[in-house]
UniProtKB/Swiss-Prot annotation:
Gene assigned in the entry: Cyp27a1
Catalytic reactions on record: 5beta-cholestane-3alpha,7alpha,12alpha-triol + 6 reduced [adrenodoxin] + 3 O2 + 5 H(+) = (25R)-3alpha,7alpha,12alpha-trihydroxy-5beta-cholestan-26-oate + 6 oxidized [adrenodoxin] + 4 H2O; cholestanol + 2 reduced [adrenodoxin] + O2 + 2 H(+) = (25R)-26-hydroxycholestanol + 2 oxidized [adrenodoxin] + H2O; (25R)-3beta-hydroxycholest-5-en-7-one-26-al + 2 reduced [adrenodoxin] + O2 + H(+) = (25R)-3beta-hydroxycholest-5-en-7-one-26-oate + 2 oxidized [adrenodoxin] + H2O; (25R)-3beta,26-dihydroxycholest-5-en-7-one + 2 reduced [adrenodoxin] + O2 + 2 H(+) = (25R)-3beta-hydroxycholest-5-en-7-one-26-al + 2 oxidized [adrenodoxin] + 2 H2O
Organism: Mus musculus
Main location: mitochondrion
Cofactor needs: heme
One CC-aspect GO term: mitochondrial inner membrane
This protein's name: Sterol 26-hydroxylase, mitochondrial
Cysteine disulfide partners in this protein: none
Modified residues (N6-acetyllysine): K142, K232, K285, K296, K375, K512, K523
Membrane-topology descriptor: Peripheral membrane protein
């Protein structure tokens, strides 16, 4: 009976008499679903319409899905936690450019490297991305200042100019090498404790969970110069509460994004979402307050000339680059960004190395050739480890931390692939789809780090398009913490491969992805760490 009801509902939702031509399952063009803001005028004037050029087409001529079909795909077909897979399906059906309508909004999806390049190279001084309304709803609800991830325009530019200090340049990131190595040493101690507790004496039952603790400890140490106990056998309760709150916030974000606002008082997702954010900001504010009090104590004791500028937040506060409210609005977001990028990427990298013993052995040989066993790698060593860098690049290609991004070009009309889009069109950049495009990456679903090495051979054509994989973004709105994240992953992977042989636990099978804004493993990744002699 239930199966019959689902089948009946499916055909009801897809019946053109119910949903109109824009939702036809065969992909009839969704002109009716394009709002007025996207109805580009087909006049004889404007860009690209001179006598010597073909007429630019209207966005209304693009194929795509309407609201009901999109909701059907999300909640009845189960794509709500697998949006990148839905984008792969839509590209196969519609081609590299299609629309998705949701309520009064219509987005233009771009799923090829040349299309991404066309949009990203037209960014202005203040690139606009998705407004992240759900994050703004929480900030507005609590009276918080917008942080770097949701601020736009001049406010975003001010935050960006302040926060890029001591982060963006490789030699600035190198300043954090000793701090990261200190945390990684503690992580390896904790790793050995977890291994010893396992039945086999060498297994880690949940690699992502353990690496999450590493990443949180590392980013907190960099931002606040404070250790918060993530790598101890017993984690402090406020730290554990923060970790739980991040998971709760992300899990409920998926439903908050796609359910209408009138459902918020009726369903549990909104309350859980708010509580998650409240705890995240409470944790961040506590760390900020402690650093402010520490700085005040130094000022009272030594005066302004005696203050020793050390860590990242200390530097920003001492130089008065951010107000108190801007600091409170931004630093909890930086904590989140610093955790998910490295922990998930390292998990995927170790998973694939465990499945690729030949690549792992080549990497071990490279690392120990530069840094023998017993020595700790330094920033300068990675200039001599091209395979290590290639492993990280290939992992980020297969699993971009944020599989989908967006841009809204507000200053002008935009010409993309023969179409003319009006100002304020939102372009969805399908990074996951693009980075698995066989025309850019042959055998796109296989783990092949050697494709990133400079030497081009018959079996290694190299990278065929520079925008095929841009996991840290592009231009002035690219990832602020890229250099820190790369350094942390290089240090972590090199030290693990130097000391252990990594093997996949029996019965693991294939690990798929789940999208909860960021891309995470669908199940616990169990690995064996075998001590090298």
């Amino acid at each position: 009976m239930a199966a019959w009801s689902r089948t009946r509902l499916r055909w009801t939702l897809l019946d053109p008499r119910v949903v109109g031509r824009g939702l036809c399952p065969q992909g009839a063009r969704a002109k009716a679903t394009i709002p007025a803001a996207l109805q580009a005028q087909e006049s004889t004037e404007g860009p690209g319409t001179g006598q010597d050029r073909p007429r630019l087409r209207s966005p209304a001529e693009l194929p795509g899905t309407g609201t009901l079909q999109f909701l059907f795909q999300l909640f009845l077909q189960g794509y709500v936690l697998h949006l990148p897979d839905l984008q792969v399906l839509n590209k196969t059906k519609y081609g590299p450019m299609w629309t998705t309508s949701f309520g009064t909004y219509t987005n233009v999806n771009l799923a090829s490297a040349p299309l991404l390049e066309q949009v990203m190279r037209q960014e202005g001084k203040y690139p606009i991305r998705d407004h992240m309304d759900q994050w703004k709803d929480h900030r507005d609800h609590k009276g918080l200042t917008y942080g770097i991830f949701i601020a736009q325009g001049e406010q975003w530019y001010h935050l960006r100019q302040a926060l890029k200090q001591r982060l963006l340049k490789p030699d600035e990131a190198a300043l954090y090498t000793d701090a990261l190595n200190e945390v990684i040493s503690d992580f390896i101690t904790r790793l050995d404790q977890v291994r010893a507790e396992s039945e086999s004496g060498d297994q880690v039952p949940d690699m992502a969970h353990l690496l999450y603790h590493l990443a949180l400890e590392a980013i907190t140490y960099i931002l606040f110069e404070k250790r918060i106990g993530c790598l101890k056998p017993s984690i402090p309760e406020d730290t554990a509460a923060f970790i739980r709150s991040v998971a709760i916030m992300f899990q409920n974000s998926v439903y908050i994004t796609f359910l209408p606002k009138w459902t918020r008082p009726l369903l549990p997702f909104w309350k859980r979402y708010l509580n998650g954010w409240d705890n995240i900001f409470s944790f961040g504010k506590k760390l900020i307050d402690e650093k402010v009090q520490e700085l005040k104590a130094q000022l009272q004791e030594t005066g302004p000339d005696g203050v020793r500028v050390s860590g990242y937040l200390h530097f920003l506060l001492t130089n008065e680059l951010l107000s108190t409210q801007e600091t409170i609005g931004t630093f909890p977001e930086l904590l989140l960004a610093g955790v998910d990028t490295t922990s998930n990427t390292l998990t995927w990298a170790l998973y694939h190395l465990s499945k690729s013993p030949e690549i792992q052995e080549a990497l071990h040989k490279e690392v120990t050739g530069v840094v023998p066993f017993g020595k700790v790698p330094q920033h300068k060593d990675f200039a001599h480890m091209p395979l290590l860098k290639a492993v990280i690049k290939e992992t980020l290609r297969l699993y971009p931390v944020v599989p989908t991004n967006s841009r809204i070009i507000t200053e002008k009309e935009t010409e993309i692939n023969g179409f003319l889009f009006p100002k304020n069109t939102q372009f969805v950049l399908c990074h996951y789809v693009v980075s698995r495009d066989p025309s850019v990456f042959p055998e796109p679903n296989s783990f092949q780090p050697h494709r990133w090495l400079r030497k081009k051979e018959a079996d290694n054509p190299g990278i065929l398009h520079p925008f095929g994989s841009v996991p840290f973004g592009y231009g002035v709105r690219s990832c602020l913490g890229r250099r820190i994240a790369e350094l942390e992953m290089q240090l972590m992977l090199s030290r693990l491969v130097q000391k252990y042989e990594i093997a996949l636990a029996p019965g693991m099978g294939e690990v798929k992805t789940v999208s909860r804004i960021v891309l995470v493993p669908s199940k616990k990744v169990r690995l064996h760490f075998l001590q090298r002699q």
